[in-house]
Amino acid sequence: MSAVYTLASRPPRPLVPPSYVNPAQMQNAQAGPSTAPSGPKKKSSPTLATVKRKRTDTPEGNSPGSPSPQPQRKGREGPKKKKANRACFHCQKAHLTCDDSRPCQRCVKRGLASNCTEGHRKKAKYLLDEEELEQLKRSKSSAPEIQGNVSAANTADPPSVPIAEPFPQNDSLLTASFDPNFSFGSEAANREYSILSAILGNPSPPESASTPPPPPPPPQSYATWTSDAIDFIGSPRLGTATSSYTSPYGESMQADTTLSTSPGNAHYLTYPYPQSQRSEDLVDMSYASQYSSAGQGQPCLPANSRPRSPPTVFLHNPSSKDQGSRGLLSPPPSNGSPSSTSSAPSGIAEIVRPQSCGSQLQSINDRVLTPYDYTEGYHFLMKHLPTRFEKNDILRIVRALAIFRPSLIALQMPLSLDDEVFVEKCFQRSLVELDKLMSFSGTPTVVWRRTGEICLVAPEFCMLTEWPMEDLVHQKKYIYELFENQSVVEYWENFASHAFENTTQSVYSHCVLLKPSGAPVPSTFCFSIRRDLFDLPSIVIGQWLPLL
C-alpha cells in the first residue's frame, strides 16, 4: 500500500514527443555544438545539373529560345577544286583559279577552248640567263620599229611631209649590253653607266648624200669641233660614249692609243676653264675661232670622206705644267695631217695612256717607297716665322704648336717604317679622290698637309688669288705663306684646338689672302681636318669665298 501511495503522490511529468534523428546525419555528424544551424540549407537539384550538361543541337549563335534561328549552312557539294600548278593564259590574266586540264573548265564554259594555252610566268630579271636577257631586249627593241612601220603605212599626210624613219634597232638604249670594262663592282651599275653612255653618245640616224646639211648648231655644240675630234668620238672603237658627261671615274679610266675603248674606258670630261689658259697654250687650237665659226655653219661630210688622224686624248697629268686644265678635255688640232698631233705644244697637256683605277693605284704603290718627312715642314716654319712676324705673334704660334705636337710625337713613336709608308700611300690615294671631288665644285679649294704644304689646288683658287698653279704645286709652297699675318696666327690656333676633335665638323673663320703683288683678298674661310688610320691629322681641306 505504501508503494502505491508513493507513486500516486508524485506529480505527473510532461510528455515530450521523441525527436526524429536522420541516420544519414548521424553518419556525417561532427564534434561541436549540439544545436543545428538555424539557416535553411539549399539542396542541389539534380534537374539543374542535367540542364547544364545538356547540349543543344542548334547552330552557334542561336539559343534555343531565340525567336528567329538562322538556317543551317549547306555543305559544299562535290570535291574541293584543286589549284593548278600553272594557270592558262586567260585565267592568269583574269586572276581566276584554273585546273590542270587543257582546255580548262573555265575556258570551255567561256567558249575559249581553242585558245586555252599555258600562261607565261614572268621571271625576275636578275634570274634571267644571258640568252633570255638578250631575247627580252630584242623583243622590246623591235616594238618601236613595228609601231613606226604601222604609222608610216597608215598615215594620210601629203607626200611633202617627211615620214619619220623607224628607230634603228642598233641605236636602241635597250641594246646597250653589259660592258665588263666598267669597274663599278656591280653588274647593275655597269649596265646603268652603259645606258647613260648610250644616251649621251648615240649619233643621229644616217642621212643620204643628197640630204642638205642641217642648220648650224648652237655655239657649244660638237659640230664646232674639228673633223679629227668628231671621228675620234664617233669611231666604232670608242663605242657610243662621248666626252660631255662628267664622271667621277673620268680621270682614272684613260684610253689607250689603240683605243679599244667602249663606254667603259670612255673619258667623261668637260671643257677647260678659259680663264686659266695662257696665250701659248692656245697655239693651233684657238677656241675663239672655233666658236665664232659655229655661226657660219660647217658642212657635214661623210665619215669616210673626212681626213683622219690618229685619235689622241689630251688629259691632265699631275706632272705637267698646265694645271689649269686638270681633268679636262682639249680637242686636238684642226688640221688633218697625221703629224699635227706631234706638233702640238707640250705646255698644253701630255698625251696620257689609258689607265684604269686599279693601275693608277698600283702606280701609287710602286712610287711610294719611303715615308714622308714631316719634320722638314716644321723646320721651314721655324725659319719662316722670324722673317715675317713680331715676337708676340711668334709666341702665339709656338704655343699653338706646343698644344698638338706632343700628341703627334706620341702617336708616331710606335709606328714602324712599313706603317709610315702605308700612311703615305693612303694619303696619296686620298688625294686622287679629292682631285675628282674638286673637279665637281666651283668653290676655291686647296688641300694641304698638316705641316701646311700645298698638295692640290683648284683653278678657282688661282683665279681668286692670281697665283699661278705651277708656283703653288710644283715649288713646295706652304698655305700660311698666302695668308696675312693675323690670319696665320688664327689658323694655327684653330688648328691646334681642332686637330684631335671631331673630324665631321669644320672650322669657320675670317681670312685675308695675299696676291703675288701683296694685295689683300678678304674672304671667309673654312677648313676641315681628316685623320689617318692611326688617328694622326693627315689632310686639311680649306675653302674660301671672297667678301664682296
From Swiss-Prot:
Q: What does this protein do?
A: Transcription factor which regulates nonfermentable carbon utilization. Activator of gluconeogenetic genes.
Q: Alphabetically list the UniProt keywords.
A: Activator, DNA-binding, Gluconeogenesis, Metal-binding, Nucleus, Transcription, Transcription regulation, Zinc
The record's section on InterPro entries has: ERT1_acuK_gluconeogen_tf (IPR050335), PAS_13 (IPR056751), Zn2-C6_fun-type_DNA-bd_sf (IPR036864), Zn2Cys6_DnaBD (IPR001138)
Q: Name one GO cellular component term.
A: nucleus
Give yes or no: UniProt keyword Disulfide bond. no
Q: Which PROSITE patterns match?
A: ZN2_CY6_FUNGAL_2
Return the SMART domains for the record: GAL4
Where is the secretion signal located?
A: none
What family is this?
A: Belongs to the ERT1/acuK family.
Q: Which Gene Ontology BP terms does the record give?
A: cellular response to starvation; gluconeogenesis
Originating organism: Laccaria bicolor (strain S238N-H82 / ATCC MYA-4686) (Bicoloured deceiver)
- Molecular-function GO terms, alphabetical: DNA-binding transcription factor activity, RNA polymerase II-specific; RNA polymerase II transcription regulatory region sequence-specific DNA binding; zinc ion binding
Q: Does the keyword NADP apply?
A: no
Name it: Transcription activator of gluconeogenesis ERT1
CDD domains, sorted: GAL4
